[in-house]
Amino acid sequence: MTGFSFVADTNFLIAVHEGKEYVESFLDGAVIVSVISEIELLGWHKLKAEEKRLLRLLLDDCIIFELTADIRKLAIEIRQQVNIKTPDAIIAATSKYLQIPLVTSDNDFKIIPGIELILI
């Protein structure tokens, strides 16, 4: 891989799935995905079988990072510091734990201290 590693927020993965050009430059690196994003992507109740198949193929090209005790602790710290949803705190904690950027189009992450954020 010639690119850099980063944690992909769920909306980044949706943009990849939809073929958005502005995310293509990121796809040369290692795409790390929190298990939370996997659940958010595949857990939508209106997801059709073909979409689910395509999303699974997309996720197969990513590294799924599980929720560890250290990430749980970081997510709790983040939630104690700022008002953010628990899934977003876990995704941010994954980025912080791995010490790699979080790529997202969600401005809510801007309030979280201690993470490197790349807004797309």
Language model regions located:
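Acidic, PIN/NYN-like endoribonuclease modules and their adjacent C-terminal/linker elements
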Residues: 1-2, 20, 92, 97-120
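Short, well-structured N-terminal submotif of metal-dependent ribonuclease cores
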Residues: 1-33, 43-56
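Short active-site oxyanion
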Residues: 4, 27-30, 61-63, 96-101
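Histidine- and aromatic-rich ligand-binding microenvironments
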Residues: 8-9, 33-34, 84-85, 106, ...
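A generic structural signal for short hydrophobic patches within well-formed alpha-helices
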Residues: 13, 38-41, 72, 109-110
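A general structural signal for well-ordered alpha-helical segments in protein cores
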Residues: 38, 52-55, 68, 72
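Amphipathic alpha-helical segments within well-ordered protein domains
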Residues: 39-42, 56-59, 76
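Active-site neighborhoods of divalent-metal-dependent phosphate/nucleic-acid chemistry enzymes
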Residues: 64-105
